[in-house]
């Protein structure tokens, strides 16, 4: 490992690897570091992505695809099912990935593009001179090191420290943190080409349960719920209750827990010598918590902007603010809209969910928007107007 680079990327998730790959393809000297000894492990998400979104960045490869999804089924609290086509189901429905392989493949692409990749290497601080970030301090296999860089990319996830070290406020309100728990399960009866979602306060107050197929009788079974909706139980306790009810004969192969920002994008994504990508910049979807595609989008934008700024010899806060503008242009409208929807949906009662699900029986969902769906529900049930008006 050298003592100086053009770019140092902290975190080898999808956003970090895309930033490293893109910058390296532009001829920059890039270091990509990952604090864990294995990239992609442990898995900390449901692993669902939309096909169109994924294909913007990489050609799908069967070796890292666990399931090809054709539809989504949403179950209201009373068990009423609404089925959506893959097209209508959203950005997290299309493929279920094998993240342990997928993340490593992205890092491998970065390496093939010319980036240096180091695992078991952790950033412990930033080098800041005259208010400008110009490198990191860290530990590699227990040994301390210092490495300078023209730009540092913070891709260290929702628990990101790098942005805070640079003076960017990354604090999340309780209502904007989704705590997640997930079991990888086998010996369960599932629909192999459907991603299933369960709503309601019994299993996931302020959130939802997901069942994402991973193969024959195998699935990621997890839930995410807002920290502000805890009722004296940890999410994993709710998850155990769901599994006991729905999959009593199933076997748990793996357990993971984590957190996802559902706040919408940070107001500030960069400063002199530093940018934030992926969950570090809170670009995950406020409704679903899904963030793989948005992370890759922000990473690619970061790599291109950084290359332009370095070529121009200007990596100041003003120059790098172009990154903020481009990410906001690409993702901001969708994230802002979905945050508003989240704020309404998390206040909707179980009864309203049930009535809405009943109202949607027999509806043709082809080319239907959220607004049209809500109008259909309200037309059939005028009493729900007050509760759902924020979605129209």
From Swiss-Prot:
Cite the binding residues for FAD. Answer: 15, 34, 45-46, 48, 99, 123, 279, 291-292
Q: Name one GO cellular component term.
A: membrane
Molecular function per GO: flavin adenine dinucleotide binding; geranylgeranyl reductase activity; oxidoreductase activity, acting on the CH-CH group of donors, iron-sulfur protein as acceptor; oxidoreductase activity, acting on the CH-CH group of donors, NAD or NADP as acceptor
UniProt cross-references to Gene3D superfamilies, sorted A to Z: D-Amino Acid Oxidase, subunit A, domain 2, FAD/NAD(P)-binding domain
Query: What InterPro entries does the annotation carry?
Result: DGGGPL_reductase (IPR023590), FAD-dep_OxRdtase_2_FAD-bd (IPR003953), FAD/NAD-bd_sf (IPR036188), Geranylgeranyl_Rdtase_fam (IPR011777), Geranylgeranyl_reductase (IPR050407), GGR_cat (IPR054715)
Biological source species:
Methanocella arvoryzae (strain DSM 22066 / NBRC 105507 / MRE50)
Any extra detail in the entry?
Reduction reaction proceeds via syn addition of hydrogen for double bonds.
Domain of life, source organism: Archaea
The record's free-text note on cofactor binding: Binds 1 FAD per subunit.
This protein is called Digeranylgeranylglycerophospholipid reductase
Q: What is its EC number?
A: 1.3.7.11
Cofactors required: FAD
Coiled coil ranges (UniProt) are none
């Amino acid at each position: 490992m050298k003592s100086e680079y053009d770019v140092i990327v902290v975190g080898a998730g999808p956003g970090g690897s895309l930033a490293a790959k893109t910058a390296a393809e532009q001829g920059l000297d890039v270091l990509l570091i990952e604090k864990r000894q294995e990239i992609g492990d442990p898995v900390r998400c449901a692993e669902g992505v939309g096909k169109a979104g994924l294909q913007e960045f990489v050609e799908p490869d069967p070796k890292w695809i666990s399931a090809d999804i054709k539809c989504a089924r949403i179950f209201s609290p009373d068990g009423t099912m609404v089925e959506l086509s893959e097209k209508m189901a959203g950005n997290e429905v299309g493929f279920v990935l094998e993240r342990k392989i997928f993340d490593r493949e992205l890092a491998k692409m970065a390496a093939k593009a010319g980036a240096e990749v180091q695992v078991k290497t952790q950033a412990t601080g930033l080098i800041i001179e005259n208010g400008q970030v110009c490198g990191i301090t860290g530990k590699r296999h227990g040994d301390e090191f210092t490495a300078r860089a023209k730009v540092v990319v913070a891709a260290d996830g929702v628990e990101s420290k790098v942005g805070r070290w640079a003076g960017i406020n990354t604090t999340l309100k309780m209502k904007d943190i989704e705590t997640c728990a997930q079991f990888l399960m086998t010996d369960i009866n599932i629909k192999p080409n459907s991603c299933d979602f369960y709503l309601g306060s019994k299993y996931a107050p302020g959130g939802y349960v997901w069942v994402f197929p991973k193969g024959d009788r195998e699935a990621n079974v997890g839930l995410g719920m807002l920290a502000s909706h805890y009722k004296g139980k940890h999410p994993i306790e709710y998850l155990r209750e769901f599994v006991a009810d729905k999959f009593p004969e199933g076997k748990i192969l793996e357990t993971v827990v984590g957190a996802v920002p559902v706040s919408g994008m940070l107001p500030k994504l960069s400063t002199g010598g530093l940018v934030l990508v992926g969950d570090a910049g809170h670009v995950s979807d406020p409704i679903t918590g899904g963030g793989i595609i948005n992370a890759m989008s922000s990473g690619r934008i970061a790599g291109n902007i950084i290359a332009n700024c370095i070529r121009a010899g200007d990596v100041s806060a003003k120059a790098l603010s172009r990154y903020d503008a481009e990410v906001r242009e690409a993702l901001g409208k969708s994230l802002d809209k979905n945050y508003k929807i989240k704020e309404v949906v998390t206040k909707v009662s179980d009864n309203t969910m049930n009535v809405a699900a009943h109202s949607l029986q027999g509806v043709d969902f082809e080319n239907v928007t959220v607004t049209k769906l809500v109008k259909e529900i309200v037309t059939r049930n005028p009493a729900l107007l007050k509760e759902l008006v924020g979605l129209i």
